[in-house]
From Swiss-Prot:
GO terms for biological process: maturation of SSU-rRNA from tricistronic rRNA transcript (SSU-rRNA, 5.8S rRNA, LSU-rRNA); protein ubiquitination. Possible role in ribosomal RNA processing. May function as a substrate receptor for CUL4-DDB1 E3 ubiquitin-protein ligase complex. It is found in: Nucleus, Nucleolus. The gene is wdsof1. Its main location: nucleus. One of its GO terms (cellular component) is small-subunit processome. Residues 417-445 are annotated as: Disordered. The lineage of its organism: Eukaryota, Amoebozoa, Evosea, Eumycetozoa, Dictyostelia. This is DDB1- and CUL4-associated factor 13. Pfam families: Sof1, WD40. SMART domains: WD40. Keywords: Nucleus, Repeat, Ribonucleoprotein, Ribosome biogenesis, rRNA processing, Ubl conjugation pathway, WD repeat. Belongs to the WD repeat DCAF13/WDSOF1 family. SUPFAM superfamilies: WD40 repeat-like (SSF50978). WD repeats lie at residues 64-104, 107-146, 154-192, 196-235, 237-277, 281-320, 324-363.
Length: 445
């Protein structure tokens, strides 16, 4: 007679330490687990509820400025080093690890309009309304700077923004009518690019195709330049003015625009006739935007005193952050590891937020990491179930934002009803403006 017995090795089954996890033996045959899907649904529901319970996005604030924060920039090599410039001409360096101030300097008379680190991280360049550009040397290893200025570049007009080309000594500034290209070693601009006579408010270098440059103007234009030539390449005219622009760090052809019409637009510069995506949850002018270093999300700061995080392929925001004391948000910034967001507002504070509101901040064991990955998978699997979707997407917002959002939705529904009624009563289909193309007025080459 043949008898089957369970045979196990003593070495494999014996724990070396009392804290070791005992190995569990499972039979993964689906016929033995008829309630596998209901169990996964309950786990997904519990994980979604716990996400909302542990959603504590606010980490802390960086206080010390005596005026509104107008611009911020992150260090290219240090995760915890950030610089900020305020409306009273003060520049401060911050340590994000300890949420403390490294150093401060009175840099300009008037607004600090632009701030950027050089690609090697050893210098910082700032520009202001006092018609000067100043280069500061960072003292290693603390990465602080003293009151001494290495170089001063004088301009004919006030500067509105600045950006540095990657792996080069070239930087660009914007002003009342033109974009100027500078070198560290030259006291005058080596190149002047102009298209029209309106004030250029923002300028940004492409991080991949480093010879490409984008700018936005006060007369609703987005202008693209190629600094290898002495003339602009393309001009996009939009329905309303743009306040800020940002290049995608992973796709050289994707450009995001923060607009006065309360939306964020993503354009493919190879085809500017229509937008790729429209992100439309704000109820006030969008003042600043920034891509995450992964290129998968966009953070935006608005005149409605809220911060929103958008997936690049979704028109709805994933998260909305606000506090009772936070005012108009002039500047937003992702940290280099994509885990945190900085916001600079008119209330003289920089606030630090988690990009994922329920993410733990401590060091995780391998089992904890596996658990979080599993929960993310099952939440993704059941995300379209109405009960889970309601819990996952529900957010509390200020009453003013809620009312404006309600009115905005009612206007949108009324337009849809009007189109439907015209079609039903006249027998003709009215011409409907497409969402992706109605923002574009014209494209000039």
């Amino acid at each position: 007679m043949k008898i089957k017995v369970i045979s196990r090795s003593e070495e494999e089954e014996t724990k070396e330490k009392a804290s070791d996890v005992r190995k569990l033996h499972r039979n993964l045959d689906p016929n033995l687990h008829p309630f596998e899907r209901p169990r996964e649904y309950v786990r997904a529901l519990n994980a979604t509820k716990l996400d909302r319970v542990f959603a504590k996005p606010f980490i802390g604030s960086l206080s010390g400025h005596t005026d509104g924060i107008f611009t911020m920039t992150r260090h290219p090599t240090l995760l915890n080093n950030v610089a900020s410039g305020s409306c009273d001409g003060v520049i401060k360096l911050w340590n994000l690890t300890s949420l403390t101030e490294r150093t401060t300097v009175q840099a300009h008379n008037g607004f600090v309009r632009g701030l950027v680190f050089t690609p090697d991280g050893k210098h910082m360049v700032s520009c202001g309304e006092d018609k000067t550009i100043k280069m500061w040397k960072l003292d290693l290893p603390e990465y602080t700077f003293n009151q001494e200025v290495i170089s001063i570049y004088n301009g004919k007009n006030a500067f509105t923004s600045i950006d540095h080309q990657l792996n080069s000594t070239t930087f660009a500034t914007s002003g009342p009518t033109s974009v100027e290209i500078w070198k560290h070693q030259r006291s005058t601009p080596i190149q002047t690019l102009q298209w029209g006579h309106s004030t250029i408010t923002k300028v940004k270098f492409n991080p991949i195709e480093t010879h490409l440059l984008a700018s936005c103007t006060t007369d609703r234009d987005i202008i693209l330049y190629d600094i290898r030539e002495n003339s602009p390449a393309q001009k996009l005219t939009t329905s309303m003015r743009s306040n800020s622009i940002a290049w995608c760090p992973t796709e050289s052809f994707t450009l995001a625009i923060a607009n006065e019409d309360e939306n964020v637009y993503q354009y493919d510069i190879r085809n500017l006739s229509k937008a790729m995506t429209v992100h439309r949850d704000h109820v006030g002018s969008v003042l600043d935007i920034d891509y995450s270093p992964t290129g998968r999300e966009i953070v935006s700061g608005s005149y409605d005193k809220t911060i929103r995080i958008f997936p690049v392929d979704s028109y709805k925001s994933r998260e909305v952050y606000y506090t009772n004391r936070m005012q108009r948000i002039f500047s937003v910034l992702f940290t280099a590891d994509s885990r945190f967001i900085l916001s600079g507002s008119d209330d003289m504070n920089i606030r630090v937020w988690k990009a994922n509101s329920s993410a733990p901040l401590g060091i995780l064991s391998n089992r904890e990491k596996e658990k979080l990955e599993y929960q993310d998978k099952i939440k993704e699997k059941f995300k379209e179930i109405p009960e889970l979707k309601t819990i996952a997407t529900h957010r509390r917002v200020p009453q003013l934002v809620y009312k404006r959002r309600f009115i905005k939705n009612e206007i949108h529904k009324a337009k849809q009803r009007r189109v439907k009624n015209i079609s039903n009563n006249s027998g003709k289909s009215p011409k409907v403006e497409k969402v992706l193309s109605k923002h574009t007025i014209k494209v000039d080459n």
